[in-house]
Regions:
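N-terminal amphipathic/basic leader segments beginning at the initiator methionine
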Residues: 1-36
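Short acidic-hydrophobic, aromatic-tinged amphipathic segments that line or gate anion-handling sites
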Residues: 29-37, 100-109, 204-207, 334-343
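Short glycine-rich or small-residue beta-strand-to-loop segments that form or flank ligand, phosphate
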Residues: 49-62, 82-85, 232-234
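Anionic-ligand anchoring segments at beta-strand to alpha-helix junctions in alpha/beta enzyme folds, i.e.
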Residues: 52-54, 68-100
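Histidine-anchored nucleotide/phosphate-binding helix
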Residues: 58-80, 247-258, 264-265
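Conserved, well-structured core segments that form the ligand-binding/active-site neighborhood
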Residues: 101-236, 242, 250
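C-terminal non-catalytic interaction/assembly regions of soluble proteins
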Residues: 247, 252, 256-375
């Protein structure tokens, strides 16, 4: 009996699954660069004493890039370099940066174009990943989400499907790129995971993002046969998945591998609860799950409600989380599991004792596409 350990918040849980019931265990296998290689890539990043380092993510990879850049620029007064990130990433970024002398501040509420005029230089550092709405996530999409609500609404309404579309660059991404095509700022796109950095791309916002997408697609996209059920584990980093809102992309990025009427189970501890935005509005009764198609002003995480609504018609969606069952099942329609044994037992009862289960670890950093014969 294979013993599979899966990340669950700040700990790991064991999945005691019989060999004959395991279709495959897939995890990201990024080729990591050495510190010397990363430093060489970053050696051309020159800071000035009135520089804003804007981190669009709090991941370990982004934190490591920031630390190396600061170390390479010790000749200037680093106290005059501002490091800012979005409020939901402040705690995570602070925890991931080992140099506690670094001051990580929350980005203010002023418009983006007003904020950047205060600084002599702007350096944006982003973590390139897959995204179910935009296809890919990076500096253009994160800036659009957080600074341009009207354009974000336009991007959401421009989608060509109500289903997740990770790895597909469509109209929403085109809108994001068009908004920042003239942005005069240096951008670093990082491809990596909790173990290190795989690649660094330093250029203007469009070129850096485009290069990162090409690299990400080449190393993380693979093919696998579809399965009747899939157990999905979020990334090996605890911080980025403290809320349900920040965890669901792992489910959306993998759901296409599940056969119709099959089961998908997400493992996400969610120590900080539901999160803000549309999911919270839904569980608190301010928005209905059935009223999420768009048209009105976009609400953060609105795509989660859209995907829940659409995919519950096709799949049995479940989650193992610390969030109360009343919210998970009663409000969002997710079947709540209490442990890995219950997950396996229910999947076997539903699909048969000879059923084979696909297990995906680190779903943030891998995009698995169905083989053509299974589509």
């Amino acid at each position: 009996m294979p013993e599979i350990w899966l990340k669950y918040g700040g700990t790991h849980i064991v999945l005691d699954i019989k060999f004959e019931n395991l279709l495959k265990h897939i995890s990201s296998n990024l080729n990591l660069s050495s510190d010397a290689q990363v430093r060489a890539k970053l050696s051309g990043v020159v800071l000035k004493e009135n520089t804003l380092i804007l981190a669009t993510d709090g991941s370990i990879s982004v934190a490591r890039a920031i630390e190396m850049i600061l170390d390479l620029n010790r000749s200037i007064d680093l106290s005059k370099v501002s490091i800012e990130t979005f409020s939901k990433y402040v705690g995570t970024l602070r925890a991931n940066i080992s140099n506690k002398a670094c001051s990580i501040e929350r980005i203010g509420s002023e418009p983006f174009d007003v904020m950047i005029k205060k600084f002599q230089k702007i350096l944006i550092i982003s973590h390139t990943k897959h995204d179910p709405l935009f296809g890919y996530c990076g500096a253009p999409t994160m800036l659009l989400r957080n600074f341009y609500p009207d354009k974000m609404t336009e991007a959401f309404n421009s989608r060509v499907t109500n289903l997740p579309a990770p790895g597909i660059a469509g109209p929403p991404l085109e809108i994001a790129l068009s908004v920042f095509s003239e942005l005069r700022a240096e951008v670093i796109e990082v491809v990596g995971n909790s173990y290190g950095i795989s690649a660094i791309f330093h250029d203007n916002i469009i070129e850096a993002f485009d290069s990162a997408l090409g690299y990400l697609s080449a190393i993380t996209e693979t093919k696998e046969i579809s399965s009747g059920s899939t157990i999905i584990c979020t990334s090996n980093e605890e911080g980025p998945h403290e809320t349900l809102s920040s965890s669901l992309n792992s489910l959306w990025n993998s759901i296409h591998l599940v056969k119709r009427n099959g089961s998908a189970v997400l493992l996400a501890e969610n120590t900080q609860g539901i999160g803000n935005g549309a999911l919270r509005d839904c569980v608190e009764g301010r928005i209905e799950l059935q009223n999420c198609l768009g048209g009105q002003t976009y609400v953060e995480g609105q795509e989660h409600l859209l995907y829940l609504r659409e995919l519950q018609l096709q799949y049995d969606l479940g989650i193992m989380s610390t969030i109360p069952q009343y919210y998970l099942n009663g409000k969002l329609g997710l079947y709540p599991y209490t442990g890995s044994k219950e997950i396996l037992n229910r999947l076997m009862e539903k699909h048969g004792r000879n059923h084979k289960i696909l297990v995906i670890s680190d779903a943030d950093n891998i995009l698995i596409k169905s083989n053509a014969e299974e589509n």
